[in-house]
């Protein structure tokens, strides 16, 4: 798998600015990642499937 900042439907990072502990781990697992954490201020996932969309600075429109 791959790792990175999971992208939402707009291609933006998933914020964890105001979220509780464990939020990013849950969000990442919903995207079939093995785990995740809050790399403040955005979620970062490990073990994402290759098909998962991740934030890319080259295509960032956020």
From Swiss-Prot:
Domain LCN-type CS-alpha/beta residues, every copy: 2-62
GO BP of this protein: defense response
The name of this protein is Alpha-toxin Tf4
Chief place where the protein resides: secreted
Query: According to the UniProt record, which cysteines are disulfide-bonded?
Result: 12-62, 16-38, 24-43, 28-45
Swiss-Prot/TrEMBL keywords: Amidation, Disulfide bond, Ion channel impairing toxin, Neurotoxin, Secreted, Toxin, Voltage-gated sodium channel impairing toxin
| Matching InterPro entries | LCN-type_CS_alpha_beta_dom (IPR044062), Scorpion_toxin-like (IPR003614), Scorpion_toxin-like_sf (IPR036574), Scorpion_toxinL (IPR018218), Scorpion_toxinL/defensin (IPR002061)
Q: Name one Pfam family in it.
A: Toxin_3
Compartments (UniProt record): Secreted
**Any one Gene Ontology cellular component term annotated for this protein:** extracellular region
In the record, Cysteine amide modifications are located at 62
Give the record's family classification. Answer: Belongs to the long (4 C-C) scorpion toxin superfamily. Sodium channel inhibitor family. Alpha subfamily.
Q: Which residues form the signal peptide?
A: none
| GO MF annotation list | sodium channel inhibitor activity; toxin activity
Q: What is known of its domains?
A: Has the structural arrangement of an alpha-helix connected to antiparallel beta-sheets by disulfide bonds (CS-alpha/beta).
Tissues expressed in: Expressed by the venom gland.
Function, please? Answer: Alpha toxins bind voltage-independently at site-3 of sodium channels (Nav) and inhibit the inactivation of the activated channels, thereby blocking neuronal transmission. This toxin is toxic to frogs but non-toxic to insect larvae (T.molitor), mammals (rats) and crustaceans (crabs) at the doses assayed.
């Amino acid at each position: 798998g791959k790792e990175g900042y999971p992208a939402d439907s707009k291609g933006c990072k998933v914020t964890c600015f105001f979220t509780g502990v464990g939020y990013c781990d849950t969000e990442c697992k919903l995207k079939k990642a093995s785990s995740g954490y809050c790399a403040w201020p955005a979620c970062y996932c490990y073990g994402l499937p290759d098909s998962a969309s991740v934030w890319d600075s080259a295509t960032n429109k956020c």
